[in-house]
Amino acid sequence: MSRLRWIVIGVLFSFALQAEAKHFIHIQEDASADQKTAVLILNGFGGTKKGCQAQMAFWADRGMDVFIPDVLLRSSLKESSDALEAFVEAQHLEDYREVKAICYIAGAYLLHTQLETHPMANLTRIVYDRSPTQERAPQTAMARIPKLGMLKLGKVLRDLSVATWPDVPESDQLKKGLAIENRATPLMRFLQEEAEAMGPLVYDWQAIDPTAHDAFHVALDHDMMYVRWDVLGEPFLHFFEHGVFPADLPRDRIHDRPFDPTYPLPE
């Protein structure tokens, strides 16, 4: 079987797993919302059932209520945004003392759209998963494998590939941090030519988001960012508490071989 066919089968399988995901919610019943902090995790296309389970396994034991909505895969990006709006309203996130968010790529689009029309005065932290390679997935997939992408993700993939992104939220109480992937997924290695044709890959965190307060680089790919809480958990908790990441984490690009699958992974 050709390498291309194996890759396509793998992509189909990973997209199929995404379709299984549902809301994951953990609520502590020992206090009212105005005495608690909520963690809102907004996944992207990589938010599989396995990924959500790994997220919940780490975050449910951290003294906060945890909300992982399944809102992305709808018939359009507009319906995805509407689904998030309905989820936030149904869970009464405005009642919490604080809300701290983790946003993957498409999840960031949904959060920013939500905040344009429904500002959250209690939102105090956002950690963004940023990936110079994976952020080109919608455009490159639509360029090379549009039928496959549309088959599994529908119009949302197409919509996101041409979407104008909402402004990045800013407020006096909000601190934003970036976790920057330095490794490409198998999908993006397959789409390397299309990704590189879009222009230079930018890894300078202050160029990626000039409004961010801090960042760190990690030798993980996008799929791993959903499950490697042994690597990501403590840095994210530290940012939630202090508004900065631990001082010993790398602020500069780790290596210049994002498409090299042999580069060592974090232990």
Each language-model region and where it sits:
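Short, surface-exposed "cap/lid" segments of acyl-processing enzymes
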Residues: F24-I27, A31-V66
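C-terminal catalytic-base region of ester-bond hydrolases, centering on the histidine
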Residues: E170-E267
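Bacterial N-terminal signal peptides that target proteins for export
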Residues: M1-I7
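Short, solvent-exposed loop/turn segments at secondary-structure junctions
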Residues: G46-G47, A108, T133-Q134, N182-T185, ...
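Serine-dependent carboxylesterase/thioesterase catalytic core
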Residues: L40, W59-P69, K78-Q173
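Short beta-strand/turn micro-motifs composed of small residues
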Residues: N43, C103, I180
